Amino acid sequence: MKIQPVFAAVVLAALVGCANDPAPTEQLKLTEQAVAQATAVGATDEEPDLVTAQTKLTQARADMAEKSYKDARMQAEQAELDARLAEARVLTQKSDAQVAQVNTRLERLRKQLGAGQ
């Protein structure tokens, strides 16, 4: 009957082993790509969301170095979302500027057509 305590110890050890978070290397890569993409579309250090993303990415790297993988994953995920938000805001600003430019041209054309009649 000594098998039961040994079996329980093995099961407990297996559960503890599964509870450890793996290193979030893939998430860090995704986050780095998201930051690079936001920068590529025109986000700068003046964009608060990009600054937040970079700060969280730096913290995620520090957490990785300390082997605090759960914290690293959470920081990296948040940084990725912040970078994507910065990218979306920059693209929205560019789109709004293009719409305003088209509206200005349309107004000029309307005036020209009205003056020609």
Regions found by a protein language model. Name each.
Residues E66-D96:
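A contiguous, mid-protein "functional segment" used to position or interact
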Residues L85-Q117:
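Surface-exposed, polar helix/loop patches in the mature regions of secreted/periplasmic/lumenal proteins
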Residues A14-G17:
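C-terminal motif of bacterial Sec signal peptides marking the signal peptidase cleavage site
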Residues A19-P22:
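Bacterial signal peptide processing site
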Residues A36-Q78:
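Post-signal-peptide N-terminal segment of Sec-exported extracytoplasmic proteins
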Residues M1-F7:
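Bacterial N-terminal signal peptides that target proteins for export
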Residues Q27-V35:
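Juxtamembrane extracytosolic/periplasmic "stalk" immediately C-terminal to the first targeting helix
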